[in-house]
Curated annotation (Swiss-Prot):
The keyword Chaperone does not apply. Pathway: Lipid metabolism; fatty acid biosynthesis. The keyword Transmembrane helix does not apply. One of its GO terms (biological process) is lipid A biosynthetic process. This is Acyl carrier protein.
Length: 79
């Protein structure tokens, strides 16, 4: 089992079609990785599926960077 961070980065690469080396913890989905609003919705859906959790819309809006996604999953996984 790979780490949560590795799994999140893999999803970001697949969903946004960016290079793995572009995906850093502080990378903003919109500003740095070129995601639009539809991309971010699909990204959240992919994270929900991968980690078998539900991310409420009001929480999803706060997740704007790779690290925020990792932190959210770490905090809510298994809680």
């Amino acid at each position: 089992m790979s780490s949560i961070e590795e799994r999140v980065k893999k999803i970001v690469v697949e969903q946004l079609g960016v290079k793995e080396e572009e995906v850093s913890g502080e990378a903003s989905f919109v500003d740095d990785l070129g995601a639009d609003s539809l991309d971010t919705v699909e990204l959240v859906m992919a994270l929900e599926e991968e980690f078998e959790c539900e991310i409420p819309d009001e929480e999803a809006e706060k997740i704007t960077t790779v690290q925020q996604a990792v932190d959210y999953i770490n905090k809510h996984l298994g809680s």
